[in-house]
UniProtKB/Swiss-Prot annotation:
Compartments it resides in: Cytoplasm
Residues that, per the record, bind S-adenosyl-L-methionine: G159, E160, S191, S214, L215, H216, N290
Name this polypeptide is given: Probable dual-specificity RNA methyltransferase RlmN
Gene name of the record: rlmN
Species annotation: Alkaliphilus oremlandii (strain OhILAs)
Disulfide cross-links: C105-C333
Gene Ontology annotations of biological process type: rRNA base methylation; tRNA methylation
Cofactor remark from the record: Binds 1 [4Fe-4S] cluster. The cluster is coordinated with 3 cysteines and an exchangeable S-adenosyl-L-methionine.
Length: 343
């Protein structure tokens, strides 16, 4: 019998397992609370009988990832982690320190299949999906290591969250549970390259998380140069799915736009982007591209970035420039894992 990862299960799923074992339903709640506190052995569950702990050990297990490497930025205190999974795969996570608390950036897949040319995470393709428990354990491990509570989550590490849809939705349910990490939906941001059917399915669930769309171009021709997913879903389809999401959830959408020197940073690109997004409940986050040596991409000048931002603002689009975090430790997505794998 294949053992079940308890950390990947919702409270309801654990309760069902316990009642099927002939135990009282409340035992499921106790176990859910234990695993989401970060315990890694059944012996630590001191309010359970030894007989029940032994039965759990026979049928289930608790995901346990390890810190393989850790770098701390001397500039802003950002912490970059390489996590070692139980099958010896490597993923990344980042903790960023803000005045409102700690934000964790976590991975949802080992590698990525999306092929975006400005991202180092996708250079070696997709290895496998992460289980919900492996996503949660990134947060638990970060909390244990820092000694502080993680108050905000961004699903912006390696992988496309909506390409691992079922596990990502389970993860959202588990971390939002008041008996677990109890992180509010409005403190969670999911970033997607734009998988249109999944955006609509997510909208129908009406989970009021923050949705961020990796747009990076104002038209299909330009977007297809950097994002293979754009060949499957036209930009008009993507924008329609975003409008549907806003209609269903009432939540503002963030459009992420990686500014690449000489590729998508021209004034005409800014004007076209303003026209595309006009009238939407949205916000544009400009991201000066991180240098990816394999692609030869460079970030634009400060003047070009501000000019692009001002053009969007004149079009009535709320626009910010993302603050660079952990620049001295290669905290950008995919950079550290790739360097580790090459050594």
């Amino acid at each position: 019998m294949e053992k079940i990862d308890l950390l990947s299960l919702t409270l309801k799923e654990i309760e069902e397992i316990l009642t099927n074992m002939g135990e009282k339903k409340f035992r499921g709640k106790q176990i859910f609370q234990w695993v989401n506190k970060g315990v890694k052995t059944f012996d630590e569950m001191t309010n359970l009988s030894k007989n029940l702990r032994d039965q759990l050990a026979e049928r289930t297990y608790i995901t346990n990832i390890k810190i393989e490497k850790k770098l701390i930025s001397s500039i802003d205190g950002t912490i970059k982690y390489l996590f070692l999974l139980e099958d010896c795969n490597i993923i990344e996570g980042v903790v960023m320190k803000y005045h409102h608390g700690l934000t964790a950036c976590i991975s949802t897949q080992v590698g990525c299949a999306m092929g975006c040319t400005f991202c180092a995470s996708t250079l070696d393709g997709l290895v496998r999906n992460l289980r919900a428990g492996e996503m949660i354990d990134q947060i638990l491990t970060m909390q244990e290591d820092t000694g502080e509570r993680i108050s905000n989550i961004v699903l912006m590490g390696s992988g496309e969250p909506l390409h691992n849809y079922d596990e990502t939705i389970n993860f959202l349910k588990i971390i939002n549970d008041e008996n677990g990490l109890n992180i509010g939906n409005r403190h969670i941001t999911l970033s997607t390259s734009g998988l249109v059917p999944q955006i609509k399915t997510l909208a129908d669930l009406k989970i009021p998380i923050n949705l961020a769309i990796s747009l990076h171009a104002p038209n299909d021709e330009l977007r297809q140069q950097t994002m293979p997913v754009a060949k499957k879903y036209a930009i008009d389809e993507l924008i329609d799915s975003c409008r549907y999401y806003i209609e269903k959830t009432g939540r503002r959408i963030t459009f992420e736009y990686a500014l690449i020197k000489g590729v998508n940073d021209r004034d005409k690109d800014a004007r076209e982007l303003g026209d595309l997004l006009k009238g939407m409940l949205c916000h544009v986050n400009l991201i000066p591209v991180n240098n990816v040596d394999e692609r030869g991409y460079k970030k634009p000048s400060i003047e070009s970035i501000h000019q692009f931002q001002n053009t969007l603002k004149k079009a009535g689009i709320e626009t910010t420039v993302r603050r660079e975090m952990g620049a001295d430790i290669n905290a950008a997505c995919g950079q550290l894992r790739r360097k580790h794998l090459q050594n």
